[in-house]
């Protein structure tokens, strides 16, 4: 019951996502220019491409499942296109070269407004599905390490930067901050992507890195050298700080790297599209994935948290695509609250 209340609190906290700043990320409260869909075609494309993080990550696992169901259940061919992270594929989505992408709720807002990790605004980004909730991330160390809590990271080597997946650094800095550790307290070892940084933990090149729970990359690294997630402080102060980012502390479910009761960070991981993708295309795909959720859930455990009640969020940070709205209205998932929220975030 307490976990359910906490998850409800996280949904509510998304509406205050944009207050304040953390780790050098500016406030994100500006309204968006929510223009109409520019692709008016009534014809479906022959294929759709989904931008994801590299193989072994949660985003890639989700994109692979969505692409497979698209290919099986429609006349379209679904393709997964992995990149170092959303920073690497966002321009392709903006230009209409990708139809969809997997991105977390904070990253989507930053991309739309050109703030935080983005030097340029990408105003055409639109939500298609609310996706996974909660998606969980934590700080991982070698199990044999004497690092037992976040404060023990002072003076240690941390994987850093992550190139095209810059949002990982934002989340990592947040987890360090709630444990009383600043970037200047650690030795920063830069990597071009998240996978390299996490593998470096097992290889002994760094002492800790951010990584998501329950993904293939964790299994791979744990096979190289047993790893362990650090327990994050489950305090009011920690949740207040994370609430600025639409996230909160949640209890980790039993999985590789969770050795005891462990608290990690949870937030929504969404499927987005753009105004360059036609209403018919987004409507068709959202309908297909909604109606074939049971099959999606056979592809990866993360789809167990890809629930219908999470697909039409009421506290979204970038607008929903008209094609998605059309479908959610048909199934009764879109309400007056959604219309009110759209007016709140759109100029």
Label each region the model flagged.
Residues 72, 178-184, 189, 198, ...:
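Secondary-structure end/capping motifs
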Residues 31-110:
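N-terminal (or domain-start) structured segment
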Residues 105-107, 113-119, 123, 141-145, ...:
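Pocket-lining segment of extracytoplasmic ligand-binding domains
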Residues 33, 126-148, 273:
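Hydrophobic/proline-rich hinge and linker segments of small-molecule sensing/allosteric domains
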Residues 45-79, 135-199, 203, 314-323:
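Bilobed "Venus flytrap"/periplasmic-binding protein-like clamshell domains
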Residues 45-46, 195, 203, 213-225, ...:
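An extracytoplasmic/periplasmic, membrane-proximal ligand-sensing/linker region
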Residues 29-50, 146-157, 322, 329-330, ...:
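Immediate post-signal peptide segment of exported/extracytoplasmic ligand-binding proteins
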Residues 16-27:
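C-terminal segment of classical bacterial N-terminal signal peptides
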């Amino acid at each position: 019951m307490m976990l359910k209340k906490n998850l409800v609190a996280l949904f509510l906290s998304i509406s205050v996502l944009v207050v304040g700043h953390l780790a050098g990320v500016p406030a994100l409260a500006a309204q968006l220019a929510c223009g109409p869909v520019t692709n008016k075609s009534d014809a479906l494309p022959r294929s759709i491409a989904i931008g994801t993080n590299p193989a072994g990550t949660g985003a890639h696992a989700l994109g692979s499942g969505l692409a497979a169901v698209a290919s099986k259940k429609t006349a379209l061919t679904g393709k997964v296109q992995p990149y170092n992270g959303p920073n690497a594929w966002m321009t392709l989505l903006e230009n209409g070269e990708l139809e969809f992408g997997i991105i977390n709720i904070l990253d989507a807002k930053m991309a739309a407004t050109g703030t935080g990790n983005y030097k340029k605004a990408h105003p055409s980004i639109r939500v298609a599905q609310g996706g996974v909730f909660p998606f969980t991330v934590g700080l991982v160390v070698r199990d044999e390490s004497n690092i037992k809590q976040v404060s023990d990271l002072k003076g240690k080597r941390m994987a850093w930067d992550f190139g095209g997946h810059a949002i990982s650094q934002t989340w990592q800095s947040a987890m360090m901050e709630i444990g009383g550790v600043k970037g200047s307290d650690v030795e920063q070892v830069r990597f071009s992507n998240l996978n390299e940084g996490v593998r470096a933990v097992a290889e002994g090149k760094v002492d800790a890195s951010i990584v998501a729970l329950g993904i293939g990359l964790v299994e791979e690294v744990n096979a190289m050298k047993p790893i362990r997630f650090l327990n994050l402080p489950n305090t009011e102060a920690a949740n207040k700080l994370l609430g600025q980012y639409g996230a909160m502390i949640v209890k980790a479910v039993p999985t590789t790297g969770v050795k005891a009761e462990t608290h990690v960070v949870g937030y929504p991981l969404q499927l987005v599209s753009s105004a360059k993708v036609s209403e018919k295309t987004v409507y068709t795909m959202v309908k297909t994935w909604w109606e074939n959720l049971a099959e999606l859930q056979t592809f990866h455990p993360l789809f167990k948290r890809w629930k219908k009640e999470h697909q039409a969020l009421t506290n979204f940070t970038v607008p929903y695509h008209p094609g998605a709205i059309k479908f959610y209205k048909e199934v009764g998932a879109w309400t007056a609250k959604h219309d009110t929220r759209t007016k709140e975030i759109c100029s």
